[in-house]
Amino acid sequence: IIEGRCVRLSQGDYAQRKVYDASPVDMAKRYADCGVKRIHVVDLDGAKSSSPKNLKLLERMAVGASVEIEWGGGLKSEEALRAIFDYGATYAIVGSVAAQKQELFAEWLEMFGGERMVLGADVRNGKVSVNGWLEDLALSIEELIEFFKPYGLSQVICTDITKDGMLKGPSFELYTDLQSRYEDVDFTVSGGIGSMADIEK
């Protein structure tokens, strides 16, 4: 979401955005009507500014559609986490803080529980990217998972940035390797899915 509207970025580039006509609330309702149980929402304004910016919109989505909402973007404090949960989010996706302040995210895992806290690990060329994909770290997703598992990590959303928004297929090899290595972690594949064949595979 940017400025209250549904958008799709190409490879995380804010300058390359496609804006969709449907409002986020209407989109959430449409997904719910199709039987979707859980939707993924990123507050891109929040990701850029380091604090949630679309809380009222989150509240309207939570009230207006009978789906679980996983919410990310700008979640860098305990107060921000409590705010999105208060406004209706079921799950919190934390990426930048988890990668850059690992002890803090470990505390949040223990505080809120691994069933609500989701590690958002966005990768580019094998390394984790943070701060709205504007900065790449010398850190792998495997290193992050290994660190957080003892604290209750059970859910990971992994996006291959080079595939994101391109609609040309995800990084099957990356996700297959991660799932086989960490069988007790639930992975959500993100980035590049452009067809039913991609989903089935």
Say what each PLM segment does:
Residues A62-Y91, E173-K201:
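Catalytic cores of alpha/beta
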Residues E3-Q16, F85, A89-D164:
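Conserved anion-binding
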